[in-house]
Swiss-Prot record:
Assigned GO CC terms: cytosol
Statement: the UniProt record of this protein carries the keyword Cytoplasm: yes
Flavoprotein in keyword set: yes
Gene (name only): mnmG
Swiss-Prot/TrEMBL keywords: Cytoplasm, FAD, Flavoprotein, NAD, tRNA processing
GO molecular function: flavin adenine dinucleotide binding
Cofactor annotation: FAD
GO BP of this protein: tRNA methylation; tRNA wobble uridine modification
NCBIfam families: mnmG_gidA
Listed name of the protein: tRNA uridine 5-carboxymethylaminomethyl modification enzyme MnmG
Binding of NAD(+), residues: 271-285
SUPFAM superfamilies: FAD/NAD(P)-binding domain
Entries under Pfam families matching the protein: GIDA (PF01134), SAM_GIDA_C (PF13932)
């Protein structure tokens, strides 16, 4: 019956699928990565960028554990920026503009070189399950492969439906067919399924953009790599450009809002809160006359530009009017239309903390199928699912990431315990221990774990050991070395500490300076860590506390508009109910306790 046997089969070669396949193969499993189109491996279907606040943390943690997204981003980046630098290092976020074609090429090169991994261009149309355990898959070529575990990483392809104004048609991504047979098969499994939607803006011919009317945006003078395997970035940079919509843009959208698939009632799926369409912005922020737009190059060898901030499901004739009403885009040519896409997703409460379905052994889900949005969230889930699929296939115990491990654990716990009612995006505010879970120390926190799990290779482990040795030496030296009679360890705790002068006095090289900066941040945050642990203990103490019958959530200080809205719609009777409410962050719970006078 079976053509071949694989230990692990990964369905879909987007960001989740690539990491899942790489992790499983690294752990010694014979792994099949199945994709409709081999040339689309690692495709960046929407924005040509990786990272951001919270998202960059996921990429750093993924890299520290032996993942590949950070390495490929460094190889393919055309502009690098560290976001939030005016704030503390705990919330600094790495972000890079990416050459989309280079990213695909570099990702495929890594996967092609990965031992134990086979890539096939075939659409999986059926999961073969016996006695509530996966045993194989069937492809559109009528080939049947037996396997020990399966990772489903289908992105927006499960019964994907594209909307451009009044027009709608089945598609997994513009130009690619949807996965209908597998969607039907998964529906038959009895899992709780819903529909989400996402959107993307038009792409322009950059040669038709008048950059003289736009503001140039460059990256950091000294780019910071994503991967701890890289000490510096050696790639040419490309600028982005900042524009603004106009009053005319607003008028065009208001006049044609009934033709938007989002507002005509044509779309039923729920979209991402933090990536609204331009129609949403005009409707929800009526007082604003203009909105900022970023023009981002899609690569070195293409003229295409991504219009960040103008995601839309308007018909194509309205898209032309909208684009040409933006200053600098009066003569712009659209080369690809913007669109919205609806797709099937499985409620993540159907999963356990290893991303295995509770109903079926050996069946793991990763990425947008779990209700998340973003390349980074997908990639992190891919590693978790691939790791555990491999361990299941080898009859080893599963590994569960906990919230205290980092953003990996925070994301999975949020998904499987709270579920989602809109696409989930990572933010630093979701972590109780965000001052500990920093980007700069991700390797110090997680590379030993990755090594223990078998995900970290020899070169990465040797690099970690060298860095750890240097950290320990600098920690000891900073306690003994004095500047103006004061130990360096005390100077580093001061907010006005000039790290450059300290390094100069200690005669440290650039690499040692980076390690000293990590130690400095550890020192600064050590006191805050104790405070947060105390706050978490207080939250646990008052979990069963009954709330007053009527609370005016608008009077609780420092709650975001999302948290207020969710609490107003909920029927929370205890502190535990507040904690369990989707979208309520740990900091919000602490603020509520303060408001209630619970010390």
């Amino acid at each position: 019956m079976f053509n071949q046997h694989f230990d692990v089969v990964v369905v879909g070669a987007g960001h989740a699928g690539c990491e899942a396949a790489h992790a499983a193969a690294t752990l010694g499993c014979r792994t099949l990565l199945s994709t409709q189109v081999i040339d689309s491996i690692g495709q960046m279907s929407c924005n040509p960028a990786i990272g951001g606040i919270g998202k960059g943390h996921l990429v750093k943690e993924l890299d520290a554990l032996g993942g590949v997204m950070g390495i490929v981003a460094d190889q393919s980046g055309i502009q690098f920026k560290k976001l939030n630098q005016r704030k503390g290092p705990a919330v600094h976020g790495s972000r890079a503009q990416i050459d989309k074609m280079a990213y695909r090429k570099n990702m495929k090169k890594i996967l092609d070189a990965c031992a134990n991994l086979e890539i096939k261009q075939a659409e999986v149309v059926e999961l073969i399950i016996k006695n509530s355990c996966v045993v194989g898959v069937k492809t559109d070529w009528n080939e049947v492969y037996s396997c020990g575990a399966i990772v489903i990483a289908t992105g927006t392809f499960l019964d994907g439906l594209i909307h451009i104004g009044e027009r709608k048609f089945p598609s997994g991504r513009l130009g690619d067919k949807e996965s209908h047979p597998l969607a039907v098969n998964i529906k038959s499994l009895g899992l709780k399924i819903s529909r989400f939607k996402t959107g993307t803006p038009p792409r322009l011919d950059g040669r038709t953009v008048n950059i003289e009317k736009l503001n140039r945006q460059d990256g950091d003078a000294i780019p910071s790599p994503f991967s701890f395997m890289h000490d510096k970035i050696e790639r040419p940079e490309m600028p982005c450009w900042i524009a603004q919509t106009s009053k005319e843009t607003k008028q065009i959208i208001e006049k044609n809002i009934h033709r938007s698939a989002m507002y005509s009632g044509q779309i039923e799926g729920v979209g991402p809160r933090y990536c609204p369409s331009i129609e949403d912005k005009i409707k929800k922020f009526k007082e604003r006359e203009v909105h900022q737009v970023f023009l981002e190059p899609e690569g070195e060898n293409t003229n295409e530009m991504y219009v960040n901030g103008v995601s839309t499901s308007m018909p194509i004739d309205v898209q032309w009017q909208m684009i040409r009403s933006i200053v600098g885009l009066e003569n712009a040519q659209i080369v690809k239309p913007g669109y919205a896409i609806e797709y099937d997703m499985v409620m993540p409460t159907e999963l356990d903390h290893t991303l295995k379905t509770k109903k079926y052994d050996g069946l793991y889900l990763a990425g947008q199928i779990n209700g998340t949005t973003g390349y980074e969230e997908a990639a992190a889930q891919g590693m978790i699912a691939g790791l555990n699929a491999a361990r299941f296939a080898k009859k080893e115990s599963s590994y569960r990431f906990e919230r205290y491990d980092g953003y990996f654990g925070v994301m999975v716990d949020d998904l499987v315990t709270r579920g989602v009612d809109e696409p989930y995006r990572m933010f630093t505010s979701r972590s109780e221990l965000r001052i500990v879970h920093r980007e700069d120390n991700a390797d110090m926190r997680l590379t030993p774990l990755g090594h223990e799990l078998g995900l970290v290779g020899h070169k990465r482990w040797e690099k970690y050991l060298s860095k750890k040795k240097q950290y320990d030496l600098l920690e000891d030296l900073s306690q003994k070395f004095k500047i103006n009679g004061q130990p360096v360890s005390e100077i580093l705790k001061r907010t006005d500490c000039d790290l450059e002068k300290v390094c100069e006095a200690m005669q440290l090289d650039a690499l040692s300076k980076n390690v000293l900066e990590i130690y400095k941040n550890d020192l600064i945050y050590s006191g805050y860590e104790k405070k947060i642990i105390a706050e978490n203990s207080r939250v646990e103490k008052y979990r069963s506390h009954v709330l007053p019958k009527e609370i005016d959530w608008s009077k609780v200080a420092s709650l975001s508009s999302e948290v207020r809205l969710r609490l107003e719609k909920s029927d929370c009777r205890t502190v535990a109910d507040v904690i369990a409410t989707k979208g309520v962050t740990p900091a919000s719970v602490v603020n509520i306790l303060i408001y209630l006078g619970l010390k």
